[in-house]
């Protein structure tokens, strides 16, 4: 059973999107179990989120998506949550797929469920697609579990699997670190097909820097340091 499921939304300068997103997510996860992490935004992201009655964590400066997710997960653990769904704050992920994640969690077959954008017919920018395919292939090989879209931030995580974990990553590599730590512990991975709506804005992922961080994480996993 999915029990108490929470929603975590990392938000950085998304005041154009956060209002619409929260109007949609409330259909599936109540405001009191929704956490928006305002990661040092210079716009009105946090103020708009508060109007929806959700819990808002504010960073005084931009600390990175990984730190936002870590802080959100810690709050879910403190409140005795069973699961956490993570969804980006820029409306690229469709909240209407939340029931599909909940259903996968209800099956009790998985400990982490990851969105898969590749079978939805969505046209992903070629550079993101290439990077994603390569990193997904590497993670699938080293973990022994097939993962089609390892870079997807739309996920559902069983909170009990995170007990005693210590994380170091604070940027986008946090999602890879979390996945590798969970697999090391024996986590079962599920996938849900999702569409993605690209809004035309440049990705905040820095390819070279994040590729180096990815290689480092995989290397640490292989020598059993993760």
Predicted regions: what is each one?
Residues 13-27:
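Short, well-formed alpha-helical segments that are part of the catalytic scaffolds
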Residues 81-90:
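Short beta-strand-to-loop acidic/aromatic patch adjacent to the donor-nucleotide binding site
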Residues 4-6, 177:
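Cell-envelope/extracellular polymer assembly enzymes that use nucleotide-activated donors
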Residues 59-78, 95-172, 198-219, 223:
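Acceptor/aglycone-binding surface of glycosyltransferases and processive sugar-polymer synthases
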Residues 38-46, 91:
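A conserved acidic beta->alpha catalytic loop
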Residues 146, 168-170, 180-197:
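Catalytic donor-sugar/metal-binding loop of nucleotide-sugar-dependent glycosyltransferases
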Residues 14-17, 41, 94:
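Donor nucleotide-sugar binding loop of glycosyltransferases
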Residues 17-20, 43-51:
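Acidic helix N-cap motif at the loop->helix transition within catalytic regions
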